[in-house]
Design a protein with these regions (language model features):
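Phosphate-group recognition and catalysis centered on beta-loop-alpha active-site segments
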Residues: 1-237
């Protein structure tokens, strides 16, 4: 599936994989999401101490693994020795790409500006630029991605009331990802007028998801994607 295939239909994104059921940001969580039939999987990307893009949310490994320390102070080899839950390892970005290839879109959240170029290189080498949406709170990371290639698909995430929609348009984004509380009917309509696709995060109950769909949101990110997949019923094709 390509990023362009998400446009014009309602879609569901698995947050850090199906992280309500499996350890977040692991291949196990990604596979569970694929089994559910999601349209996209979102994962977090950082660099190891030796500059390899790995999939983990926090700056440190403390919360999600049995280890302690900063991701950037550990080599890939050291990171791979850790248990990220249920015996899973911290995946490489390349492993996640291999897992989703031909099955769904990948939302790769750049947790640091320095991850942009190495992540782009891997995605391009794997021939998956059309299947990956690079997203970030960091405008600089998205600007860097567009500079690396105008073909890169990018989306701006924001969690506070701001000029996020305007900023996204200026950055050359196709997507904007507001916290769901900021996805008001007015904001969604404005984003659509700017030609942006709106993805709200993170929603784990069907009632809130249905209300967001009513407001015109295009996609929803969830830790429990199976709870909201039924909202796709109105899609054509």
């Amino acid at each position: 599936m390509k990023v362009g295939d998400l446009k014009g239909r309602f879609f569901v994104v698995a947050h850090r994989g199906a992280s309500g059921y499996e350890p977040e940001n692991t291949l196990r969580a990604v596979r569970r999401a694929l089994e559910m039939g999601v349209d996209a999987v979102e994962v977090d990307v950082r660099l190891s101490g030796d500059g390899v893009p790995v999939v983990i949310h926090d700056e440190s490994v403390d919360r999600t693994t049995n280890g302690k320390g900063l991701v950037k102070s550990m080599s890939v080899e050291e990171l791979r020795r850790l248990d990220a839950g249920k015996g899973e390892r911290i995946p490489l970005l390349s492993e996640v790409l291999e897992e989703v290839k031909g099955k769904c879109v990948l939302f790769a959240e750049l947790k640091e500006v320095g991850a942009a170029a190495p992540a782009f290189k891997i995605v391009e080498e794997m021939g998956m630029l059309d299947s990956v949406l690079f997203i970030s709170f960091e405008q600089e990371a998205l600007a860097a991605m567009k500079q690396l290639s105008p073909r890169s698909h990018v989306g701006l995430i924001y969690a506070k009331p701001s000029d996020g929609i305007v900023a996204a348009k200026h950055l050359g984004c196709e997507f904007v990802l507001p916290h769901y509380r900021l996805a008001t009917e007015k904001a969604v309509a404005f984003a659509h007028r700017m030609g942006l696709t709106v993805v709200a995060w993170t929603v784990d109950d069907a009632e809130t998801a249905a209300e967001l769909k009513r407001r015109g949101v295009d996609g929803i990110t969830s830790n429990y994607p199976d709870r909201i997949l039924s909202l796709r019923k109105g899609n054509s094709g």
